[in-house]
Amino acid sequence: NVIKKHKPELDMERVYLNAHTHGIEPHRHIDDGDYTIIYYPRLDWKTEWGGGTFVNDKFVEYKGNRLIIFTASMPHQAQAVSRQCYELRTCVVFKTNVKKD
């Protein structure tokens, strides 16, 4: 399990697939829980399509097979997808909490 490998002290609460296309304007938000983990599965994603993520005002480029982990209370926002992209921007999101003894 990818979470146990990178953050063994976490329990997974929810997991879901997030997806959007050009024309969808994501909003800046924070998550509940302790940590958010985002996995970018699209190996065919092109840099010029955009679709990365801003975490606490730092940009993380969408690269296939990339995993990012950050404190859930950090403001974050998906980057809009370019008009040149006719594909679906997808990411798998894991909402986690620190294990309680």
Describe these PLM feature segments:
Residues 1-67, 73-101:
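Fe(II)/2-oxoglutarate oxygenase catalytic core
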